[in-house]
Design a protein with these regions (language model features):
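C-terminal catalytic domains of large/alpha subunits in multi-subunit enzymes
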Residues: 1-27, 31-35, 74-283
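Conserved beta-alpha junction segments in alpha/beta enzyme cores
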Residues: 27-60, 66
Length: 283
């Protein structure tokens, strides 16, 4: 992010403008932040496979525009080595799905995703145990791929799923995530600000940000989320909450007349999302 913003070329020292243009003085700054709530509190998920090979994920996690339900489908499909279109997600019904802290504080993909992955792994374990009971082959000697049971010690030996799960039977796995407190997402933001020393006008003229997002499950959505936050700058430069100094009441007549910028007024801005292995599920 620092390289993308050209920080070394622009920063001249604290209190020193990076450049000047008439009455306008330009300065650069940076800010760091961390969001530590994504792994907290427990999550629980059930994953069920039918004898026809379809898979249903039961979770109370709610789709609120981030694509999290598609993320669960990807995670479970990858764990079970089956096409994504064979995986569905149940409606978010707390009376039918396992208890969960829910979709809040950026935890849906991290906490719910790990819980879904563990449920898929538990489903495979139960499937291999059932194969041992019905075919007499140790559970440790099985693999599951493309909807077929394959023997590890003899790759030529392949069994259809319905040989183990007799129609209309099904098999389920459960996944639990207890929650942790150190799955922190790190962010850095660089901005260039122009201040007119005669009029006092403040303008953001350039921005570049960076995020450590862990494992990126949906690259386009992640990039869009990181860049679309830019409208939040208006909280700092175009909005003001006036407080009564005696009783701390808000004196603004209303909260609906903030001067939001148009798309054409947005300065150049970009963002880079980096992957890391911090807090990644590895058990």
């Amino acid at each position: 992010a620092a390289e993308g913003f050209r920080w070394k070329d622009r920063f001249k020292g604290w209190g020193i403008p990076s450049r000047a243009d008439g009455s306008r003085r330009y300065g650069v700054g940076m800010g760091l932040s961390g969001h530590s709530d994504i792994g907290g509190m427990a999550s629980n998920t059930n994953v069920t496979m039918t004898s026809a090979g379809g898979v249903m994920i039961q979770t109370v996690m709610t789709e609120f525009g981030s694509g999290v339900r598609d993320v669960y489908r990807k995670i479970v499909a990858e764990e079970l080595c089956i096409p994504v279109d064979r995986v569905r997600v149940s409606i978010s019904d707390t009376s039918a799905a396992p208890l969960d802290f829910g979709s809040i504080a950026s935890r849906s993909t991290y906490s719910g995703g790990i819980s879904a992955q563990r449920a898929a792994r538990d489903l495979k374990k139960n499937l291999f145990q059932l194969a041992e009971e019905r075919l007499g082959i140790p559970a440790s000697d099985w693999d599951f791929k493309d909807g077929m049971l394959k023997r590890l010690s003899n790759p030529e030996e392949v069994h259809d799923l319905h040989e183990i799960l007799i129609y209309p039977d099904s098999l389920s796995g459960t996944g639990h995530w207890p929650g942790i407190d150190n799955a922190t997402i790190m962010h850095v933001q660089f901005v260039e600000v122009a201040v007119d020393t005669e009029t006092g006008l403040i303008e953001i003229t350039d921005h570049f940000g960076g995020s450590d997002a862990g494992t990126i499950m949906n690259p386009r959505a992640a990039y869009n989320q990181m860049t679309s936050f830019f409208a939040g700058l208006d909280v700092a430069i175009r909005e003001e909450t006036v407080w009564d100094k005696w009783d701390n009441k808000v004196l603004n007549p209303n909260l609906i007349e903030y001067k939001a910028r148009t798309f054409n007024e947005a300065p150049p801005h970009d963002h880079v999302c980096l992957e890391s292995t911090k807090g990644r599920e590895s058990d």
